[in-house]
């Protein structure tokens, strides 16, 4: 699997299929990614992004999926703890400690609860935590799904900061950790290099700092 961090919380997984998670980037567009499946963790503008204009098969929590359907998006709803299969891609929705509202004057309001995703494709398991605070059941995500990669927010203020994300990484146990949702704006500035150094000094986990548009290959483990 080829993993590309497009910026903020937006990640493209490329294997036999292409999965785009949280299709928002602060500059430019994700239109050229041409995903087979879009996953949206919650309704905030910096995560739902271009989901409406892409109009690709999309998975989100039920309330948000219904909003997207009303906008002409072929969206499928699910809920936390559930798993669906789409064209050989297994998607499990996990909890996240965050809010979820739709930034649309015509449809403002609750968009269900925020979530994360475990994605399994081509023998690789990726956990995208979405926007979240630290919670102890991250240990169960590690025990149940054994992710190869954990994508964790570190920006603080609206999500975990680096201190909490260090604990989350150890709870989950993924050998590869990639920080997301930081340094997009001043309010979520974070020291990613310090985060990497602290984790790699105290654990056997590896932290990879990708720049926007940079990629890495994740070999199959199953």
Swiss-Prot record:
Swiss-Prot/TrEMBL keywords: Hydrolase
Domain of life the protein comes from: Archaea
Keyword Hydrolase: yes
Pfam families: Lactamase_B_3 (PF13483)
GO molecular function terms attached to this record: hydrolase activity
Family (UniProt): Belongs to the UPF0173 family.
Name the record gives this protein: UPF0173 metal-dependent hydrolase Mboo_0816
Organism whose genome encodes this protein: Methanoregula boonei (strain DSM 21154 / JCM 14090 / 6A8)
């Amino acid at each position: 699997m080829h993993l590309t961090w497009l910026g903020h919380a937006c990640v493209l997984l490329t294997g036999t299929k292409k999965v785009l998670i949280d299709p928002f980037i602060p500059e430019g567009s994700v239109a050229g990614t041409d995903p087979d499946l879009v996953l949206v963790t919650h309704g905030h503008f910096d995560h739902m992004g271009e989901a409406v204009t892409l109009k690709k098969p999309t998975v989100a929590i039920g309330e948000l999926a219904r909003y997207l359907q009303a906008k002409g998006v072929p969206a499928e709803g699910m809920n936390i703890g559930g798993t669906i299969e789409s064209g050989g891609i297994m998607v499990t929705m996990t909890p996240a400690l965050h809010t979820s509202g739709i930034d649309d004057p015509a449809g403002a309001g609750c968009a269900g609860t925020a979530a994360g995703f475990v994605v399994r494709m081509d023998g690789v398991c990726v956990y995208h935590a979405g926007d979240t605070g630290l919670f102890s059941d991250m240990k169960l995500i590690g025990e149940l799904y054994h992710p190869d990669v954990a994508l964790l927010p570190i920006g603080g203020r609206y999500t975990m900061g680096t201190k909490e994300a260090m604990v989350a990484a150890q709870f989950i146990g993924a050998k590869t950790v990639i920080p997301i949702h930081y340094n997009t704006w001043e309010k979520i500035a974070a020291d990613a290099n310090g985060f990497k150094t602290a984790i790699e000094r105290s654990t056997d986990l590896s932290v990879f700092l990708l720049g926007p548009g940079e990629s890495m290959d994740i070999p199959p483990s199953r």
